Each structure stands twice: as C-alpha cells, then as structure tokens.
C-alpha cells in the first residue's frame, strides 16, 4: 500500500469536521434557532480555515513551484475547492429551508423589498439615529488600495453608481461590530408575527440616504462581498525589540496581509468582479467563491430567539461541586488540601476556579501566585484577581502567551494592564508557545509552604467554560505541585535542564513518554496481558504517533479514538488498523478536553492534557499532561469516556471516505452522551 494512502490530508479531515457541524444544522431533532446558530458556527469555522490552513497551503504551493517540485499541493487545493463548494451549496439549501421553518413559527427574516410603509419609515429613522454615523463610502478610484483599506472578514456592499453610460464604484462596510446584525422591526398584523431584518438590507434600503447630495446618479445597485486574509505573521527579530513590540508590529502586518479568499454575490456584474479581483490582488491560488446575498454568517452564532422557548436548547444549569460547600471547610484551600477535586465543564460551574483565585488575592496566608494565560474572557475576573493580589502585596507572576492566534491583541492589552499594576509579566520565547493551563498558589500553613495547583485541558475563560468541555484538576498533592513549580521554572528559563517524574511536559518528554507507553501496550498484547489505548483528542495528525498507533493495532492492541476535529489516521485498514475504532461527536457543547488512557497490564494510566497529538503540540509548545493519581477521580473520567463511546445519537464514524456516517443505534438504548454526562455528574454531586 502506498504511503499516501495511510493518511488523510489534515485539510480534508478538517473540512470533514466542519461538515459534521453542518449536519447539526440539518438535524431536525435540534431546536430551530440552534440549527440556525450551527450555520453560524460552520461559517466562522470556515473563515478560520481559510485564514490559517488554506493560507498555509497557498504558501506551500508558491514555494514548491519556485523549487520546481511536485504538484501534490495543487491537487489538494483542487480537492479543497471542490469539497467547500459542495458544502456551501448544502449550506445555502439549509439556510432557505430554515427561513421557511422560521416563518412557520411566525419569525420572518425579511429583505428591503418586503417592507411595509410603516416599516420603511421606521427604518429610515433607525438608519439616521443609529447607523449613519458608522457609514463612510470607500470610493474605488485607479489609485485606491483596497488591500490597505478593507478589513479582514467584514462584509461589504459593492455599490454601482450609474449615471448614463458611466459607472463608478464604491464600497460600504457593514458595521456589525457597532450595530446589531439582526434588527427587530415593528410588528404588522397579525401581531404574533415577529419580523426581523439584516443590517445588510437596511443599508441596501438606505442607499439613497447615503449617496444623495454627493453624487448624480440614475441608479444605485449593491452587491455583497467579503475578503479573508492570511492570518500568519512574521516575527522579524531585532536586537532591541521586545516580544510585545514584535507582536504589535506583526498584528499591524496581519491587517494588510494578502487575501486568500474572495466571496461575492453571484449576480454581481462581471465588470465589478474583475475590478475587485484586481484591486485585491486575488491570484490563481486564492479561493474565489460566488455566493448568495449574505456573507459573514458567523453572526448567526448569536441569532436571537424571538419566538417560543422550545426553539432553543433546554438550559442545563451548571452544577456546583458539592465538596466546596461542605460546612467543615473555611475556604477553597481547606477543601483541596483534604482531597483532589476534579471539575468538568460546562457541566460544573467555572465559578469554583474564579472563587479560589479571588480568595487567593486577599488571603493573608497566600505568599505567591503564578498563572499562565492563553485565552481569557473579555472582562476577565481572573485578571482582576491577579491585579488585586499584587495590590495586596502578593508576589504575582503571570505568563502571557502573546502568540495565541487571534487573541494576540487582547493579550498585549492584558500584559500592559498587569505590568502597570505591578504584576511580574513574562512571555514565552518566540516560536515556543505556552499552551498549558496552569496556576500555582503558595500558601504559608503552620510554618510551612503548601502549594495548590491547577492543571487543565482548557483556557481560563469564563465564556468558553460555558460552551467547551474541559477538565480542571485542583490538587495539593506535593508530587504534582512540585512538578508544576518546575514547569513555571522551565517557562522562565526554557534552556535550563529539567526533569519530571509524573507530568508529561512538551517539548521535554511528551514524545518519548507517549512512544514508551504505546510500546508497552504492544509488548503487553504480545505477552497476552491486558492491553488497550483510548484517546480523546481535538486533533490527531502527527505521523510519528499515528504510525505508533498503527503498530499497536497490528500487534492486537485495541485502540479507541474519539477525535473532534482533524484525524489523519485511517481506521479499519486491513492488516494495519483493523483494531482501531474512531468516532467523532458534535453536539451542543464543543468537545475540547484531551484524555489519554493506557490499559497498562490492568493498572490503567489516565492522563488529562492540554496537548493534541499534533507535531506542534508535542515538539514545539509547552504543554502539560497530568496523571490522575486519585483512584476515585480516575474512575470518574473512565466512566465519562464510557458514556461518550456509548453515544447512539451524535456519534459519527471517522473513515477513509470522510463520510461522517452516524454510528447506528441498532438494538441499543438511545444515549445522547452530553445529556447523559450531565445526569451522571448531577447524580455524583447529589451523592457526595
């Protein structure tokens, strides 16, 4: 079998994941408004795909052509374009289907040609009061540099200003960052109808109000368009430049980076399309997509529910971990010192972590706090707690990852604010991102320093903790806390030798330990001992690790994979991966936690990790995986994994064809894993 047939291209696997998101929009068992929101998630994901993965492929093609190498990347480009086009056609059909379904529920998303006289008058007033101040046309002249002017991933209206045989062009930015994209209109009879209009169509209706008095014209025509830029940046190293200065400079570079995708309304006149292509320097390698009347469907993630409660998911109230509420504990430190605590979001509330850091900020016994931030919420209470701690005389160290893609600007802001408050802020070395999720609190107790650590799979972010599944381990176990302390020392001195006995730390020992653990399962299988590997990951694309899993399967080791996103491994290849089962789950929460389980001859090893099985996470980032040393917590994670693999509603097979076939239920009972996990955790908390 040729080597290329052993792996699925990661770009195609990623698109297959996004097609699973589109399946959720098509799933009639999902509430109507949630289906509309899944269209927004699909669109947002696709934007990121073009910014990152497509842009990277484009760079590879240009380099390979300059070197005269093979055309594999160009062939892959064609397959990507074909797959995206097919999915976009399905997207358009689903959108129209959902509009009809909303109308049946008395929700009407109307356009500028469907307005009543009363609504027309109301819209002109709305435009003058709320919208006009945000609208400034960009006139397209021979010397206009649109690459410089246009914002990444914003929708624009390209306007024809027609006077006799002369046509001038202008662009209008749709300011959805300043004015809501969805505007409720005054109801008409019957009163139960709830009309809405998109911001795009308000501008279309008010074109006269924008251009009248400045241009003579016979007609104005508007067509939507959007451009996506390459999200990469170069860190140009200068002796005197700090990393923060380099990142600030690089972000400005991203604002004018080359376009990689141009989407336009398919009935836009050819002459206008060509003007825009030329002005945006769209090359033959870029994605040029004729689309519908509307772009930036990512705003549909926040599609409002103006109808009945059953049009959205039934809320699942976040659960408190009852251990923290025990009467014998004066504070969170007492509870954690008594025993390790495991939180699983979004089923558990993130409030416990926020409260622990708040307590640490003023507790007289706390000496020092160290934490690393990768992506935090816009109004982060964690940042506030670190500032309060510094004001209260604690020694506070915050490791800020300035290279967190799409959060760089926010993190530069936080770094400046923390520094001004007297917090010791440190950054990763360029090219070595810190993706671990750690904090360490040092506390004076009975004359000794006791340390409390957090090791997690997700970010310290109040918002995403309501949407992403992630674990937080809170522990005072010195075997773990001492090694978390070493990780922070390694971050501050990345070139000083350091060793770990319990933690798996990238880039120090992760690859070696993972290889050793897979090889141990192979040896156990060959000796007739219990063997098995179970992995829950966002992405599995590192070829070295994929090959190790193939070797395990060939040796008779059962391998169970739950991979949300990219998976280069192909299950069920005869003689290679017969013993590998791979599924993916897409549901109301984004599956984000990473779990590694090794049978280990009957004494299971269970790790929670910040790292996916990607080369960058294993070799080029600081990542941390922790073993669960408490048998009670280990069993809890094993139970949750069992529930996930028993899903008969939202689980799909990962296969060579990228078919996204649902796992058949057969005669098994109906299990929707995320709802079952909620019930499982709720029962645990009630029995504590």
Curated annotation (Swiss-Prot):
Keywords: ATP-binding, Kinase, Magnesium, Metal-binding, Nucleotide-binding, Phosphoprotein, Transferase
Active-site residue numbers: 435 (phosphohistidine intermediate)
Enzyme Commission designation: 2.7.4.1
Record PTM: An intermediate of this reaction is the autophosphorylated ppk in which a phosphate is covalently linked to a histidine residue through a N-P bond.
Residues where ATP binds: 45, 468, 564, 592
Job description of the protein: Catalyzes the reversible transfer of the terminal phosphate of ATP to form a long-chain polyphosphate (polyP).
Listed name of the protein: Polyphosphate kinase
């Amino acid at each position: 079998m040729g080597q290329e047939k052993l792996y699925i291209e990661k770009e195609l696997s990623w698109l297959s994941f996004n097609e699973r998101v589109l399946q959720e929009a098509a799933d009639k068992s999902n509430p109507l408004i949630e289906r509309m929101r899944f269209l927004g998630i699909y669109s947002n994901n696709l934007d990121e795909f073009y910014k990152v993965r497509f842009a990277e492929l484009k760079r590879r093609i240009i380099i390979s052509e300059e070197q005269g190498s093979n055309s594999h990347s160009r062939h892959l480009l064609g397959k990507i374009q074909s797959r995206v086009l097919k999915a976009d056609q399905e997207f358009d059909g689903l959108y129209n289907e959902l509009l009809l379904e909303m109308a049946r529920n008395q929700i009407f998303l109307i356009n500028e040609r469907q307005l009543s006289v009363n609504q027309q008058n109301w819209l002109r007033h709305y435009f003058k009061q709320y919208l006009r101040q945000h609208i400034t046309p960009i006139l397209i002249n021979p010397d206009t540099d649109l690459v410089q002017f246009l914002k990444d991933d914003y929708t624009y209206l390209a306007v024809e200003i027609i006077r006799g045989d002369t046509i001038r062009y202008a662009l209008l930015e749709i300011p959805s960052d300043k004015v809501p994209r969805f505007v409720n209109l005054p109801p008409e009879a019957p009163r139960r109808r709830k009309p809405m209009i998109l911001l795009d169509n308000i501008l279309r209706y008010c074109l006269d109000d924008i251009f009248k008095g400045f241009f003579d014209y016979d007609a104005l025509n508007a067509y939507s368009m959007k451009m996506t830029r390459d999200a990469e940046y170069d860190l140009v190293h200068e002796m005197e430049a700090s990393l923060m200065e380099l990142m600030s400079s690089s972000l400005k570079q991203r604002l004018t980076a080359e376009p990689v995708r141009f989407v336009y309304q398919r009935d836009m006149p050819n002459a206008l399309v060509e003007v825009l292509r030329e002005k945006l320097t769209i090359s033959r390698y870029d994605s040029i997509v004729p689309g519908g009347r509307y772009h930036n469907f990512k705003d549909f993630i926040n599609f409002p529910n103006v109808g009945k409660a059953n049009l959205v998911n039934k809320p699942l109230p976040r659960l408190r971990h009852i251990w923290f509420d025990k009467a014998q504990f004066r504070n969170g430190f007492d509870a954690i010192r008594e025993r390790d605590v495991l939180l699983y979001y979004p089923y558990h509330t993130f409030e416990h972590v926020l409260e622990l850091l708040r307590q640490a900020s003023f507790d007289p016994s706390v000496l020092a706090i160290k934490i690393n931030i990768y992506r935090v919420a816009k109004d982060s209470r964690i940042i506030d707690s670190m500032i309060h701690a510094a004001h209260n005389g604690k020694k506070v160290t915050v490791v800020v990852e300035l290279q967190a893609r799409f959060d760089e600007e926010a993190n530069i802001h936080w770094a400046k604010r923390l520094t001004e408050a007297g917090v010791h802020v440190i950054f990763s070395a360029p090219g070595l991102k810190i993706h671990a999720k750690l904090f360490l609190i040092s506390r004076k107790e009975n004359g000794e320093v006791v340390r409390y650590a957090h090791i997690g799979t997700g970010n310290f972010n109040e918002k995403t903790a309501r949407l992403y599944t992630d674990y937080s381990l809170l522990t005072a176990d010195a075997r773990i806390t001492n090694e978390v302390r070493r990780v922070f020392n390694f971050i501050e001195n990345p070139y000083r030798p350091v060793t770990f006995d319990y933690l798996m730390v990238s880039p120090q020992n992760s690859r070696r330990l993972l290889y050793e653990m897979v090889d141990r399962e192979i040896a156990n299988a060959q000796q007739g001992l219990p063997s098995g590997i179970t992995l829950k990951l966002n992405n599995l694309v590192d070829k070295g690790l994929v090959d190790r899993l193939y070797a395990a399967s060939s040796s008779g080791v059962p391998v169970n994979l739950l991979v949300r996103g990219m998976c280069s491994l192909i299950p069920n290849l005869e003689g290679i991966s017969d013993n590998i089962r791979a599924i993916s789950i897409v549901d109301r929460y984004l599956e984000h936690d990473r779990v590694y389980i090794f049978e280990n001859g009957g004494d299971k090893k269970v790790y929670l990790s910040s790292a996916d099985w990607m080369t960058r996470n294993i070799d080029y980032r600081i990542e941390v995986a922790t073993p669960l040393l408490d048998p009670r917590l280990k069993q809890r994670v094993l139970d949750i994994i069992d529930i996930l693999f028993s899903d008969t509603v939202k689980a799909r097979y990962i296969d060579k064809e990228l078919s996204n076939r649902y796992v058949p239920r057969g005669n098994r009972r109906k299990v929707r894993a995320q709802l079952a996990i909620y019930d499982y955790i709720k029962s645990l908390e009630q029995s504590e």
